[in-house]
Amino acid sequence: MAIGVFDSGVGGLTVHHRLVERFPDADFVYLADQANAPYGGRPGEEIVELTKAGCIRLFEAGCDLVVLACNTAASVALRRLQQTWLPGYRRETGRALNVLGIVVPTIEAATGLPWEHEAERRGEKVEKLDILGVFSTPATARSRVYEIEIDKRRQDVAVFSEPCPELARMIEAGAPREELKAVIEGHVQALRTRIGRAPDRAILGCTHYEIVADLFREALPPGTPLIRQPEATADALARYLDRHPEFDPGRSGLRRFLTTGEPGAQNSLVETFWGGPLSFEPA
């Protein structure tokens, strides 16, 4: 089998790149739903249906395991698909299939605790000693997944989300770096104003943002730790494959890149990040 990696666009390539480095012999199929990107401003029901369609396309391409390398899809659609759609689809196809996301590994990295751990609540107020900023799409911010799930595990962490409605679209379109820099600086300043100071740590809660992580570092105070989703996801996938040997990621080093958009319409930001051009096939 192959491992499928799904995103609304090219941002998930940041996760895919790290997975390929971590599992160089494994087979991978990447799907970018660029015809519908970005997902961040869409209603929840649309996000669920688009994510389901992407998973089906990757299953049809020979993947048994799909990683949602899209915070919006993972935060809005993953749990619902796992609970209400995937069990029936497994029975229908007779295949052992699963869908994972990048939010769980990110929360594990942010809290230093396994997903299964939830803090005991004793009723007393816990002082918030650690301020964590989350830069994300509007849909991810509306879901409050980071606030809710981190608070379950670390009540001493205060989470502040800063929705960045235009940023993923700009990165997807290959906007000039100076324009991206100005937008990022504006969102960092907006978050600082709301908190009253800079965050102690930050999550780039959209995989597109990893492409311009250096601009976030420049906008944040020097030395502000960034929780890196590609690394956290690769670590989590390694643990998952160890626990589930039935998901064999293959050994031929297959690399396929699919898009629902125009195959030749990839931008220079992606090529710079990847280290060269990528050849996409129509999905």
From Swiss-Prot:
Keyword hit for Cell wall biogenesis/degradation: yes
Broadest EC class assigned to this enzyme: isomerase
Superkingdom of origin organism: Bacteria
Catalytic residues (positions): C70, C206
Disulfide bridge map: none
PANTHER family, alphabetized: GLUTAMATE RACEMASE (PTHR21198:SF2)
Role, per record: Provides the (R)-glutamate required for cell wall biosynthesis.
Record protein name field: Glutamate racemase
Taxonomy of the source species: Bacteria, Pseudomonadati, Pseudomonadota, Alphaproteobacteria, Caulobacterales
